[in-house]
Every structure is written in structure tokens, then in C-alpha cells.
Amino acid sequence: MAGLPNSSNALQQWHHLFEAEGTKRSPQAQQHLQQLLRTGLPTRKHENWKYTPLEGLINSQFVSIAGEISPQQRDALALTLDSVRLVFVDGRYVPALSDATEGSGYEVSINDDRQGLPDAIQAEVFLHLTESLAQSVTHIAVKRGQRPAKPLLLMHITQGVAGEEVNTAHYRHHLDLAEGAEATVIEHFVSLNDARHFTGARFTINVAANAHLQHIKLAFENPLSHHFAHNDLLLAEDATAFSHSFLLGGAVLRHNTSTQLNGENSTLRINSLAMPVKNEVCDTRTWLEHNKGFCNSRQLHKTIVSDKGRAVFNGLINVAQHAIKTDGQMTNNNLLMGKLAEVDTKPQLEIYADDVKCSHGATVGRIDDEQIFYLRSRGINQQDAQQMIIYAFAAEQTEALRDEGLKQQVLARIGQRLPGGAR
């Protein structure tokens, strides 16, 4: 079994956590576990894992705790947002902390039925881990032509434990957005305390013909957390999906978005903003398959890297042989705020069709001294000038948020991670 020197110990622990549930695990979860054990954990020698440090994670003692929190603890971490909220604590759904969904336009069932869930677009070891260890699946449906008045908020609260142990929590959701339906879904990840924990997340979304999805992910976990996520989007003809991810917290945060455009005239937007600080690593990955013609995609991924932080971007657009009139663009812009900050970027195109319009690009730079001088000459001090430029750099992402209150809360989180703190 290939992998890190201590990977077998981590795999054995995860196997033990799986077996602790006895016969509760579905056949599909068992298959994912077997695939995980066969594959093993990657090393830095694997190209796709070259910049994602796993040593600190796999040397841990993993536990799975069923924590309880009060409504007051939930509220202290919650977004101020008029929404239909489902609350999950340490990988488990908590009805007492969640809103009722009757009459909301969202049909929700929570069980371990995994039949009919889509296959992974791009499977890898941590996807198999989450699929095997997730306690249940949250099945969400918006029926044909329905347009729920409120967004659906999936709030995930994970707590760390004292000492050497690491609480591991895995969340598995699936959304079916039926023909002509329209919905906004928000994933919110937070930490209950400042101790280490490991979060695994998996969200698959079917966007049917003429349906419209607004998806927002807010990863606001603590500086010691590890977070590995895999989101799959599948779009039918004339479907639209906008996905905005704000990756603002975690020692190691790796977020994968994989998409298939399986119907003509579908439209996709994927935006992300990552802000690793101190020694944090944030790894953003996208995989996009243009499988049908006349589709349009735009991706804009930005990072602001401070101190000794590291940002990684790896994105690929694949245009199938008969996907004519494809229009796909992918851009990665990176702003370095520290002398030891690092960025590794790899946008890629694979085109097998004629008559397409595709492009990719990446930029890496620092704040222009002339910009600082211009603002200083107008009476703005050095730190305020620097922060104004950073906010302007991030604005292209935050302005995509329709709800003004939510936008202000994201901006506040950004401010907490700025050099010198928010002003």
C-alpha cells in the first residue's frame, strides 16, 4: 500500500471508526472504505498532493465524538440571515437546533440511503473517507418549478478535543433541483472551540433543465482545523449554477469543485476567495467537463496570502469532442502579502473539439508601491492604504453575494484575517 510512513496507522484508525458503527453502514459506504484501504494515502511525490501537507494530520489519534451544544452556543457561531437552517454537530444532524422545513419549498430527509446518488466525477482518497465515515446522507429536493422564498443554510459545527486526539466529523449532502426550480443553498462550516479537528465534506448537486442554483460555501473553521471537501455539480440543458466559495480558516484546507455540463446551453460560474495566514495552506481545485455544446463557463479564483501562508490552485477545463461553441474561461489571481508567502498555480485546458473559445490565465503579484504612495499622498496611513487595496482586490468576489447582510459578515471575516486586523 503506497502512502506516507504512518499512513497505515491512520487507515487502521479510520477502519476502526467505520467498524464501530457495526451493520449501520450502507453497502456503498463499505465500497468506499475498501477503495480507501486499497489506495492508501498519497505522499508529496504524488503530483496532485505535492503542496498539501498531510503529515500533521495522519500522525493524529482520531476519535468520533457525539457532542451536544446549546442553542446559545449555536447562536454565537451562526450567521445573521433569514433562512431555513439545518444544523449538524460533529457530523450528525440535530433536529432540536434546526428549523422545520415543512412548507419551506425544501423537502429534506436524512438517512443512509445512498442508492441513486451520482458517481464521483473525480474520486480521491479523502472523498472515499468521507463517503465511508459520514453517519448519514442529507437528501434535499426542490420540486419542479418551485422557488423557495428563503435560502437553505446548512450549518456545520465541529468541536476539537483536548490533548492529542483529533475529532473527525464527516458531512454528506445531496440536492436535487428539479426542472425549472430555483434555490440558494449555503454551506457554513465553523469550529466550536480552538482545538484541533478534522472535517470531511461531500455535496453532490443535480441541476435539472432550466433550473437555477446559487451555491455559497463559507469555510470559517479554526486555525488548527483540517478541512477536505468535495463538491460535484451536474448541469442539464439550459441550467444555470453559480458557486461562490470563501475559504477563510483552517490549518490545511483543500476544496474540490468538480462539474459536468451535460446539457446544451448550460451556464456555470465558479468563484473562490482564499486567505491563508501564518502557516496555513489553502488548496483550491476545480475540474470542469464541457460535455455538450453551446455551454458557457467562467471561473475566477483569488487568493490573498499573508505571513508564511501558502495558496495552491489547480484547475482544469476539459472540452469533449462534440462540445462545439464551448465558451470557457478560467482565471486565478494571487496577491502576496508576506515575503515568505507562497503561491503555486496550475490552470489547464484539454480541448478535443473545434470551434470553441477557451482561455486560462494566472497572475501572482504584490501590492504596487505606486498605489500605496497615491493613497498616502491623500492622507491615508500605510496600514489603511494596504487594507483598502486588499478589500478592492476581494470585492469582485464579495460583490457576487446578493444578500447585503451576508456580504457584510463575509467582509468582517476577511477583515479578521488582514495584516493588522480589521480597521
Regions found by a protein language model. Name each.
Residues 116-380, 394, 401-423:
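Conserved beta-strand/loop scaffold segments within soluble protein domains that form the structured core
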